[in-house]
Amino acid sequence: MINTLSILIPTYNNVCVELVKSLQAQASLLYSSSDSLSSSSHFEYEILVADDGSTDERTIEGNRIINTLPHCRYIERKENVGRAAIRNFLAREAKYTWLLFIDSNMNVISHQYLANYLKEKESDVVYGGYQIKRDAETRERLKYNLRYIFESAGTQNGNHLQRQAHPYADFHTSNFIVKRSILLKHPFDEWFSHYGYEDVLCGKTLKDNHIPILHVDNPLGYEHFIGNMSFLYKTEESLRTLYQFRNELQGYSKIIDYAHKLKRWHLYPPCQYLFPLLSLPIKARLTGNKPSIFMFNI
């Protein structure tokens, strides 16, 4: 049974006060309702937000409100160390047995979010997934947003039964609970200092060490979608990360599999010739008013 929980939120240039307030309100209710229980069943919690060297002073100032909330702490760090290192830092700072990692751009969509995790059967790692809004108003407002189109095209993450069929490949490093002892023994690889694929390697590490992942239906919401140009930049950055760690991620990326097929079919040279000629028109289409998921996948 999970009765001590450190909620860990890395952030960068993003005000996440509302997320923290939502989590703190739920945790406070669980804390109060457990007062009458035995000491072994009493719920204890903390919420730690680590700022990974934000450059926007307004977001830093905005997040300082977190320090006024019970059991909450906002940790300001001057140096940007990257997604892996900041998570390892939070794990070391945490004082409780169980860790819940959440990205700062997500939001709580269920009043029973924390309670749902606490009632799950105990597993070394539990992943709850995420979901995006698909109502008519949101679809109309974001119909030209490439990130939204990309996420809408995928349905796998919202279905925990589908995810459980491929527990390591469909694992992400936001909205998951893990034993602190496990993460300290198998930390995030800090060579991943840039964006992308640290969650894939984390899943691979868990599999290699025979650590089970339980997939459950307990999603967080994802509704902050960056612009098309920024999303393309992030995608290119993640592909550079993938190339850098292509040996470590062998068998865990369809892109690597496709690259091997191109080599095997002797199509690598034509692709290397054509891509510089086509990349600018493709980027123009992807950052325009009618981005194509087909062109993005190319």
What are these regions (language model features)?
Residues 13-37:
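Short, well-formed alpha-helical segments that are part of the catalytic scaffolds
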Residues 51-62, 103-107:
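A conserved acidic beta->alpha catalytic loop
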Residues 77-94:
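Glycine-rich, basic loop-to-helix element that forms the pyrophosphate-binding segment
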Residues 99:
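Short aromatic/hydrophobic "clamp" motif used to bind/position activated sugar donors
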Residues 111-143:
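Conserved donor NDP-sugar-binding/catalytic core segment of glycosyltransferases
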Residues 146-168:
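Short, flexible, basic/aromatic active-site loop/helix in glycosyltransferases
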Residues 194-202:
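Acidic donor-binding loop at a coil-to-helix junction in glycosyltransferase catalytic cores
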Residues 234-245, 251-298:
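Non-catalytic, C-terminal membrane-associated alpha-helical segments of glycosyltransferases
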